[in-house]
């Protein structure tokens, strides 16, 4: 099959605000899709840019005593750093305040003018006498003229969805100075869409999903209204050719920025190439600009329209809109100062299903899903298998037996199903399938009990570990669009330099395994709590770009926990010396019936025999078998404790909080049953 040629864009982030975790829903999922396409061997170019024009930029720069150019340069630097640290990889990230965009905007405008689509109308407009400027839609608030909802912007109502002119608002006020504006007449340019009524009505169903097209087509029951494309000076943007003191409305040149970024990347010819697919990823709040005005502008100027517009919903946190007061309006930088980017990328993948439904981020579920699935289920295979192979078997993979080969083949066979989910942007289903493979691999591992067989049959153990690690390798390949850095580390483990989608069909046998490298960490709820508190405290969470960069020095490493439990009473060293800490190999681990906390753990303690310990750590191990084969540290000389469920013969050391983060203290592959731990 011939490789596809694809151009992909995400909506342009505005240069007057921080990137926050709501924005990242779009950029992260676009990055998933682009990386997948590249792994499939397709030529896929991902372009984006900062949206830099408009009154907010001008006013913000004026307040700070700097030029708009200085403001947008600073903002772009921060945006690029945030995207980079979240492992979002653009082929070109540009700016709309560019010579390419100016040239293309004028070209597209003149084409519409020549076709007679541009008209002039004198219209009433709100003017603030204190600020000495006509007020853009977003700089005036008042009562919705349709439903009576208060505190609505001058272009549309959040309550009823109606659109209107700012002069129609009841009790309007300037959002900059809170003064009541006056009405003044001003001549403006309008882009008439009605001449393209038939074209757009046919275009929309073929290039959007049914839920989006059904909404848009409601507007076609009547003649399409003209679209005001000009703004009065003072304004930061491109002046309209032949129109003194009139500037292109930001939504005219913003989408043209896609083409300008492509041109800046040296790939301008791809846009109109009939063999190239064009895809936009956008939020549902900007549908009308991308699915009505934008294809109309492109069509009038002889440019190809997008192949498909992919629309997603908004992000809610703990079931509510993001809130500054609750600390859930979190900037990308505040997140990175407290938590690793891989965790959010994985969680978003597990939740995104390619629909316009809003996506929920539940912070407790976030911790649990990352710890249980990514760390405890998937990474656990590499951790247990890789470290045992390196420490006990010289790091050499062997050959697989029939059972192991069947497991690996199952993983290979799942490849096209997972690929289809990626293609359809059903990333949640891709994650489900990968987790099913992880379940099968863990079941195989636990059934073969390599922690036991290593004592009596090293080659049998090598066969088991070879199959388990090959299964993990395939899963890591399937995860690469979601977790690129994680996958690169896994790739080095197997001594490889490049993975594409077809790499999953190969197996690694009778070869050396590289050094095991840390892949993923468990999330501590305290890290999440620290992030929430930081979000409450930082003024940058208002959505404005702060004066100073808040770049993390540790690039997303977990932050130090601000608070901890108070120290208990002081003890002497002699007290500590009384403890006899030993290593025990977990022979079996099972849930204690009718208990929500207890696990029954049987330890092989070497010459000391076996110990049964009841431990309240069930919350950290949703699947008790995860502990089997682990070498854990326990207090061996603790007096036996009679409990209602039996006699507990020791205490297992635990670090963290059961059910949230942490686990039994392990030293796998270092010691053996009965060894003293010092």
Residue ranges of predicted features:
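Helix-rich, typically C-terminal accessory recognition domains appended to large enzymatic cores
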Residues: 365-401, 410-512, 635
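N-terminal, positively charged nucleic-acid-binding surface of large information/translation enzymes
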Residues: 1-203
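A non-catalytic, amphipathic alpha-helix used as a structural packing/dimerization or gating element
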Residues: 32, 70-81, 107, 215, ...
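Structured secondary-structure scaffolds
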Residues: 1-48, 100-104, 172-391, 430-434
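Short, glycine-/Ser/Thr-/acidic-enriched flexible segments
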Residues: 13-14, 150-152, 179, 234, ...
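Beta-strand segments within the central parallel beta-sheet cores of soluble alpha/beta enzyme folds
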Residues: 308-311, 491-493, 600
């Amino acid at each position: 099959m011939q490789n596809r040629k694809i151009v992909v864009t995400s909506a342009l982030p505005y240069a007057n605000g921080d990137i926050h975790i709501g924005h990242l829903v779009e950029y992260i999922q676009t990055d998933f899709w682009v990386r997948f396409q590249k792994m499939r061997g397709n030529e896929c170019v991902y372009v984006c840019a900062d949206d830099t024009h408009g009154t907010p930029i001008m006013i913000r720069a004026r307040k700070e005593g700097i030029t708009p150019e200085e403001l947008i340069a600073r903002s772009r630097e921060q945006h690029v750093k945030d995207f980079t640290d979240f492992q979002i990889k653009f082929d070109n990230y540009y700016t709309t305040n560019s010579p390419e965009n100016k040239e293309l905007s004028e070209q597209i405008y003149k084409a519409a003018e020549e076709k007679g689509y541009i008209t002039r109308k004198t219209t009433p407009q709100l003017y603030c006498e204190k600020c000495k400027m006509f007020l853009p839609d977003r700089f005036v608030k008042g009562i919705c003229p349709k439903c009576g909802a208060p505190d609505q912007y001058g272009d549309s109502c959040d309550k009823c969805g109606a659109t209107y002119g700012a002069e129609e608002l009841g009790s309007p006020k300037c959002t900059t100075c809170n003064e009541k504006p006056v009405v003044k007449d001003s001549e403006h340019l309008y882009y008439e869409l009605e001449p393209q009524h038939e074209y757009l009505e046919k275009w929309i169903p073929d290039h959007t999903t049914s839920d989006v097209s059904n909404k848009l087509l409601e507007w076609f029951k009547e003649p399409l209204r003209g679209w005001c494309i000009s703004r009065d000076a003072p304004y930061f943007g491109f002046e309209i050719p032949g129109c003194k003191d009139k500037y292109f409305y930001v939504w005219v040149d913003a989408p043209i920025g896609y083409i300008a970024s492509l041109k800046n990347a040296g790939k301008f010819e791809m846009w109109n190439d009939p063999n190239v697919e064009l895809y936009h990823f956008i939020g549902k709040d900007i549908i009308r600009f991308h699915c009505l005005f934008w294809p109309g502008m492109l069509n009038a100027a002889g440019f190809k329209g997008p192949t498909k517009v992919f629309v997603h919903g908004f992000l809610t946190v703990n079931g509510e809109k993001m809130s500054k007061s609750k600390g859930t309006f979190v900037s990308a930088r505040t997140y990175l100062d407290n938590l690793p980017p891989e965790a959010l990328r994985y969680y978003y993948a597990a939740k995104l299903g390619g629909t316009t439904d809003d996506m929920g981020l539940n912070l407790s579920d976030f911790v649990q899903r990352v710890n249980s699935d990514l760390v405890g289920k998937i990474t656990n295979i590499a951790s247990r298998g890789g470290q045992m192979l390196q420490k006990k078997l010289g790091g050499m993979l062997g050959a697989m037996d029939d059972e192991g080969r069947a497991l690996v083949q199952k993983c290979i066979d799942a490849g096209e199903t997972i690929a289809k989910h990626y293609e359809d942007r059903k990333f949640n289903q891709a994650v489900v399938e990968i987790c099913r493979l992880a379940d099968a691999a863990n079941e195989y591992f636990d059934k073969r009990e390599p922690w036991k067989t290593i004592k009596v049959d090293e080659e049998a153990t090598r066969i088991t570990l070879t199959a388990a690690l090959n299964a993990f390798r395939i899963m890591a390949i399937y995860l690469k669009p979601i977790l690129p850095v994680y996958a690169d580390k896994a790739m080095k483990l197997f001594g490889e330099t490049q993975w594409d989608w077809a790499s999953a069909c190969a197996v690694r046998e009778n070869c050396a395994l590289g050094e095991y490298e840390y892949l993923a960490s468990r999330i501590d709820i305290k890290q999440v709590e620290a992030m929430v508190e930081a979000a409450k405290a930082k003024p940058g969470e208002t959505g404005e770009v702060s004066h100073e960069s808040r770049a993390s020095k540790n690039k997303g490493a977990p932050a130090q926990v601000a608070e901890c439990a108070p120290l208990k009473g002081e003890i002497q060293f002699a007290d500590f010396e009384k403890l006899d800490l030993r290593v025990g190999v977990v022979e079996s681990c099972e849930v204690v019936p009718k208990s929500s906390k207890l696990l029954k753990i049987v330890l092989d303690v070497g010459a000391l025999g076996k110990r049964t310990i009841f431990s309240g750590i069930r919350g950290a191990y949703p699947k008790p078998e995860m502990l089997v084969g682990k070498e854990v540290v326990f207090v061996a000389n603790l007096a036996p404790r009679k409990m209602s469920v039996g006699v507990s013969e020791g205490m297992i050391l635990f670090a963290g909080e059961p059910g949230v983060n942490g686990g039994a203290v392990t030293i796998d592959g270092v010691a053996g049953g009965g060894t003293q731990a010092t």
